[in-house]
Amino acid sequence: MLQNNHEVRIRVWEKIGLPLAFAAASMLAACGGGGGGDTASTPITPVADGGLSKVASLGKKIFSDQSLSASGKQSCATCHNPDNAHAQSNDLAVQLGGANLDVPGFRAVPSLRYLNLTPAFFFASDGTPTGGFNRDGRVNTLADQSERPFLAPHEMANDSRANVIVKLKQAAYVEEFRQVFGASILDNSDDAFNRIQLALQQYQKEDTDFHPYDSKYDQFLAGKVSLDAAELRGLALFNNPAKGNCVACHLSAKGSDGSSPLFTDFTFDNLGVPRNPAIAATADPAYHDLGLCGPDRTDLSSRSALCGAFKVPTLRNVATRKVFFHNGYFKTLREAVSFYVKRDTNPELWYPADANGVVQKFNDLPEQYRKNVNVTEVPYNRQPNMPPALSDSEVDDVVQFLGTLTDGYKAQ
């Protein structure tokens, strides 16, 4: 089960580490990602304008182009707001899309920051699922990741790739698109769509706004600033395997090569987050989002031990988030941290009780998958009436530390 693999998986990740991820990212950039077509034939060379290649500059325009949606009012930037760490700027559990912007989604919007070193999905030597994009790791490149938002009925809601290209032909930058990818590129909708994917991928890889590494914590690691007393206490609790133990999944130290910490090990965990009635789909009691084994991901549906596991996100910019976890159940960072340490000591705080007053713990999972939830690792290895791994004041300190992971810190 996933919860038994944490100690092993970190040793595995430290071995393969960031060099593997960086090599994978570089290789994908060279071959144009996995968007299909012959994207490798498109040269990607830097230009002086903003330091972006011509392909990435196109990607920047596409990223903010609302006309490529069925509503004409939604772009990538609508849900991934650059002014909020490329994440949602409201506190809705899920966003609304579709032709009339009234179709609810199924998962909270993740940030697009610090995704450029994400490796393609694989199983580590100990069997730990690792990497991939989206909360279930079902696609292997940033290029592949960009397809569904254009076509999903609850997002930009185009009915086909060809429909996206019809809209692209009316865009102000269409001639630039032809100049970069060839005069006849729009003659084949699949080829043209593949170039859209490539452009979006390159924009996210090349533009340092997606990975600036300029938080207070980055500057602290570089010896440029100091953390205050509460932040230092929070860092110690974050790293302490007997207290917060956050570092078990959210790596906080520089890599052996001096690389900045990404605050994720790219693995998956099953936390048993409460069911969120704010998501319209949950009105159907038969609906369950099982992460690695469905409903969006289908290739692992028979791997019952994986059901309920979601990808460990980076904690960079977590203090800017408006909702937390895959279903957006929690609205504040303090609530989210408190859930980690009181989920098992005080489950009544988070889960409903049945008619007999019995708390329905892990109520967003079918009964047969509740055994998959991580209950062996600190801070989850507690029982009711035991003290939580962190006191309320210690939770406050961890929250203070997490605030140091926000990009764009300016020393006073």
Task: Indicate residue ranges for each PLM-predicted region.
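Post-cleavage N-terminal segment of exported redox proteins
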Residues: M1-I62, P153, R161-L232, A236, ...
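Compositionally biased, low-complexity linear motifs
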Residues: N5, A152-E155, K342-T345
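Short glycine/threonine-rich turn/loop motifs
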Residues: D38-E147, P212-A353
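Extracellular low-complexity, Gly/Ser/Thr-rich intrinsically disordered linkers
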Residues: T314-Q412
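Periplasmic c-type cytochrome electron-transfer domains
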Residues: N100-K205, H326-E335, S393-V398
